[in-house]
Structures are given as C-alpha cells and as structure tokens.
C-alpha cells in the first residue's frame, strides 16, 4: 500500500515577477527566451543544471543537424540558423564553406548545412549570447509545481539552494523537454518509452594523430554512440529495452543501462592508446512526454498550413521532406497562458521524432517566445494571439513559414527497423561520429 504524508502549509517567498518565464535552458528554451526578449518584454529562464544547451551540450549530442533540405534549399532561417553559428562562434567546426555566409540557396549537390561543435566552447558562447540578449538566466533551479488559478498558471514553485521559492509571470513557456509544466498544470499529454542511447567522447591515438595532422580537432576527438535498440519483431526479448523518461524509476534504469554499455565498451578497449574522456551528465532520452495540443504534426502531413509558424524537416534524409508546423501545436485549449516548445510540442508518430532535432526545437522555441511576447503586450490568452502578427514577425526575422515550389518534390523516406549488415563496432556515421550498436540492431536511416 502506497504511503502518504501531509506537509504543513507555509509561506513561500516570491523572488521574481516577470513577463515571460521559460522552463528549460535547452536550445528550445534559449530560442524562446531570446525571441521574447527581442520583442521588448522581461524574460526569466529557469534551468535545472548549470549549463545552457540541454542535450546539445550536457547530453553530448553536439551535432547541429541540417537546416537545408539536401537539394540546396535552406529550410530553417531565423534563430535556428543563428544558433548554429552561435555554437561555433568560438569552436572548431566542419560547416561547409558554401553555407558560411548564410545564403538561402546553394548548388543542389552541396554538402548539408550542418556542423559539429565543441561543447565547452558552445556552452560559453550560449552564456554570452543570452546575456547580450537581456535574458535573466537562473541556473541550478528545478521547477517543482505550478501555482494555478483556474486554467491559468500564475506562477511556479522552484527548488534551489535558497530553498523553495516562487516565480510569477504573465506567460509561461514549457521547454523542459518532458512537458513537466503542461502535465502538472492539467493539460493532456502522451508519453513514450524510448531506446537506450549513450554518446561520449574518446581519444584514440591513431585517430587523434590523423586529426592533428589534418588540423581537424573535431576529428581528433570523435564522439561514439552506443545503444540498445529493439528490433520491432514479434516476440523479440529486446522489446523491453526502452525506458520511461518521466519517472524516477525510468530515468535511473536508463542511466544504469547506458552506463553499463559504456563500461562494457571500456572493458573491451583497455589499452594504452585509448581513453574515454567525457560522459554525458544528463540522460540522453530522445522523446519522453509531449503535449497533446489543439493540433499536431503528423509524419504524412504534406500540405499548406495557414497557421504555420515555420517549416521543419526530417533532417537526415536527402532530400528531406519539408513540413509546415501549425501554431496550434504549441498550445492546448486547457491552459490560457502556457506554450510548449522543443521536442515536447504536439506531434505524433514519426512526426514527433522529427520535432526532437535541434533545428526544429529552436524553431518552435522562437515561435513560442515571440507569441508569448505578443500575448503579454496585447493582454490576450494563447488562444487569442494574432496569428498573422506572429507570422509577420517570424518572417521578418528570417523564418521560412511555408514550403517553396523547390521543396515540394522531396518525398518521405520509408522507415523500418532492421538488422544491419555491418557487424557491431563498425563506424557507420562519418569521421566525426562512430557508431557501435552493442546488440547489433539499429533503426535504418537513423544513424544519429
């Protein structure tokens, strides 16, 4: 029988009142906070760790995936493009020269508009970027629960070294990655157990030597991926090798399994010319819980959406299918002043997987932050935001709202689960990332 205790009521100090409050300092939260601040409202960002960037930094997924469609057409502009360049401002990179000046198009056979980046350099650059944009960032502070008045969030309770405190705001953006605010505030959500995945950086003497000789430090210190991926076959015992990132038990199981993979790999590679030099310090869940919004993105959506806040792509496909994401995928009818941003926006099936990529997370963050600022200025709810006003601001800032004729021919790739032909341990990504699938299974086409 589950036990409960009653906690005595006590007064909680209000330490901040602001216009827009963002929960989560990943790429979506950064974009949301900066976009809102650029519209002239006061913004506070609450981050549970001590670095910005989320999975891109503390999760070691330091690959800014393509923002072009693979046919030479830039799909993501605005902050999605800006943040790519912020991440490499002080870092080595492998950005193709053809894209360095931020053109809208390039030759169709050009390399993809993407780059790897150095994590510490990106962290420091993101600190500088948010400070320059006037965002008040509060580190080492964990969102606990919302303060509700009907269907309106009036504030949030935060736990930190100062104890339990309250932050009050007019508009809230949930960029937690796990829909923590929208779930605890009573909105509908969907959860998904996802595969165990583990990225880390390593030093291998031969690889390092080649990288140094070529003047390529990113190649000298490559990433490695280990994972447990279910085959999808009937009766496969690997089907239970997934974890729920919304529970304490699920998170701890994920950590146990992922570090177990790393330990097994380390035991098999104990030699003088090899060293594991960094481990992620946040669980590397792909998807956990997402908003069930007023509308959603589906994988087979290939049509014009009047309320589009920007285009998104299945980044690893070449050519990549281009989709339009609806404003209604950021909101729910059940909450009057809360937006979702990042991997937890309203998208189903493979559409949800598309929305977890860094560029898509930044896009939804920029849209949510801009919309929140509009709502503050106009004194309206999230449902009453003037979509045309939002779209004009986004478009003026470089966001591609709708597919162009050149993008319409890109067709979806058929995704399936399969056993790879290569043996476990074979490098199958590129010279910057090597992939080892301990169990010998992978998702075809999903090499990230």
Locations of regions flagged by a protein language model:
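Membrane-embedded transmembrane-helix bundle of lipid-linked glycan/lipid transferases
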Residues: 8, 21-23, 32
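N-terminal Rossmann-fold NAD(P) dinucleotide-binding loop
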Residues: 29
